[in-house]
Amino acid sequence: MKSHQGHQKKRRMREMGFSTLLLGASLLLPVSVSASAPPSIYSRPYDSSPFLSPQIPLEDLSSLSGTHEFTLRHIFHRGTYQHPDLHRRLDIQPHTQLWVLSEDGTDKEAAEFDTPLIASSHPVTIQRLADRRPSVIEEHLLAARMSGSASVLSESDWVMDTLAGPDVTDKNSVLTFAKMTANDYIQEPDTEDWQDIHGRFNYSSSFGWQTDGLRGHIYADKTNSTIVISLKGTSPALFDGAGTTTNDKLNDNLYFSCCCGQGGSYLWRQVCDCQKSAFTANLTCIIEAMNDENRYYRAALDLYSNVTELYPDANVWLTGHSLGGAMTSLLGLTYGLPAVTFEAVPEALPAARLGLPSPPGHDPRLPQSRRYTGAYHFGHTADPVYMGTCNGVSSVCTWGGYAMESACHTGQMCVYDTVDDKGWRVAIGTHRIKAVISDVLEVYDDVPQCAPEEECYDCELWKFFRSNGSEHTTTTTTTTTTTTTPPSTSTSTCKTPGWWGCLDESTTTTATSTSTTSTSTTTCKTPGWFGCKDPTTSTTATPEPSLTTTLPLMTSTTCAHPGWFGCRDPTSPTSTPTQTPPPGDTTSCESPGFFWGCWDPKTTSDHPITTPP
């Protein structure tokens, strides 16, 4: 009975508490509305209600479809290696003169924007974080960097949004995005129109800042409701020194190699020292190198945050080619943005290592298993970079120093089968974006159907381990000391020194050597061209006699007639060495042959056969 009354009391208190809160909220609501507090740039419409979850009105899906005409509005340049503090912006005006460089960096021509860039939008469903403020995203990335794995977020932190995204089923729209990526090689020569977003130095007089860093081109439609960020991809030059090729190679080998260019060809450029043994590496060391502030991914995050400050309410799309396409996809996975890439390097490997947020039910170590990412990767089967096969010993990528070992894409792949359809051979020359536009995108009547990649894994031969990041490399040297003791010698005083030593009398040393040898004594009766043709008749074992050698004993103790090279006094030896030769048969030949052998008539001799003891 008491228990039942207690439950009723608790229920009444909860009901009273909830009613009191609603009454207080209704009383404070007019005051909140009348307040003139400045709105925050990160505020959302549902932030004013602390009790009810945000109710997003369901829009008509037909309103998400439309046509957009884009124009180039800005060029952002984010420094990395040589100028890590550099971040500049060039606003495109009607009088701005731009130049387009060829993909090999040798030719240039004036840029023309007469052809409109038209793309269609289509509803796209993306599973992304509900709170996508840059400060919140940075907290998730920092936690992943400190712990070594992606942050574990609850299911309530994720939303399934349907928004207006690029129509990847429309050929003209796909061509428009490809042309945007081709224009990523635009440079502005000899102008002072660049604005410093932040930076401690004046780079207007520097000639090298444009060759260092990541460049992004910002396209916007007429209403500024949709913008496209296009990131610059890898230049095709194989050797260092052409524009940003050196930095591109460092980032390629850092993000898309199993261990920073280690453990493979000696031609690969190594960008870290994290390998500990054959196919074994320190994953913590690799992740720390990838998160350095002078890397392209960090530059892409900074570039995106500055672009969204200019267009805070715009719908953002991403596009890029090659390395720029991979950075585009990583940026899209981070913020939940639709991305369209062309011939992008497989980027699932760096996505897993960077610790990008992953929704519940998905393994963060396998981002290629995620669905609803909004990423679409266009490419063809003759491109070894896109297919993840540009890593063999004889491949052009290897000879150029690139270690592209990753093979898995996130999102969906839209593949043109140029090998079967056109009989193309796999070659690096088909990777260039202008060749892709003219020979693939414009030639095919329809775009391929996009589908996720199935059963793909990276670096299966490698073993990775984690550490606390405080290890340092030590070298152990083992020194072996060998002490040699010289043999004992007798020391005496030389009474008669000479020019080349002491002339005192020497001592007598007797050396006795005893050995047993087996000899064969025969007489050749039938000599041949290449030796004796007689059969072996007997074998006699004879012990070798002892050999005794006696050194002469000098009788003189003083030198009466010293010379330049010794004493000229006569010496008298006390003994003479004797040597007893071993017994043997002696046969003389009276008629020798012209070349070898003996022509004497055959003689018969008896040889007794003895039995060995």
Swiss-Prot record:
Which is one GO molecular function term here? phospholipase activity
Q: Which PROSITE patterns match?
A: LIPASE_SER (PS00120)
| Record field: catalytic activity | a triacylglycerol + H2O = a diacylglycerol + a fatty acid + H(+)
List the transmembrane segments: 21-43
The family database entries (Gene3D superfamilies) matched by this protein are listed as:
alpha/beta hydrolase (3.40.50.1820)
Taken from the record's topology, the Lumenal segments are 44-613
Q: What EC number(s) does this enzyme carry?
A: 3.1.1.3
Report the main location listed first in the record: membrane
What cellular component terms from Gene Ontology apply here? multivesicular body membrane; vacuolar lumen
The region called Disordered is annotated at 472-492
Gene Ontology BP, a term: phosphatidylserine catabolic process
Q: Which InterPro entries match?
A: AB_hydrolase_fold, ATG15_Lipase, Fungal_lipase-type
Which residue positions carry a glycan here?
202, 224, 282, 306, 468
Q: What class of enzyme is it?
A: hydrolase
Report keywords, A-Z.
Answer: Autophagy, Endosome, Glycoprotein, Hydrolase, Lipid degradation, Lipid metabolism, Membrane, Signal-anchor, Transmembrane, Transmembrane helix
Where does the UniProt annotation locate this protein? Endosome, Multivesicular body membrane; Prevacuolar compartment membrane
Regions of compositional bias (Low complexity) in chain numbering: 473-492
Active site annotation, chain numbering? 322 (charge relay system)
Topology in the lipid bilayer: Single-pass type II membrane protein
* Family (UniProt): Belongs to the AB hydrolase superfamily. Lipase family.
What this protein is reported to do is described as: Lipase which is essential for lysis of subvacuolar cytoplasm to vacuole targeted bodies and intravacuolar autophagic bodies. Involved in the lysis of intravacuolar multivesicular body (MVB) vesicles. The intravacuolar membrane disintegration by atg15 is critical to life span extension.
Q: How does it assemble?
A: Binds to both phosphatidylinositol (PI) and phosphatidylinositol 3,5-bisphosphate (PIP2).
Q: Which PANTHER family match?
A: LIPASE ATG15-RELATED (PTHR47175:SF2)
Q: What is this protein called?
A: Putative lipase atg15
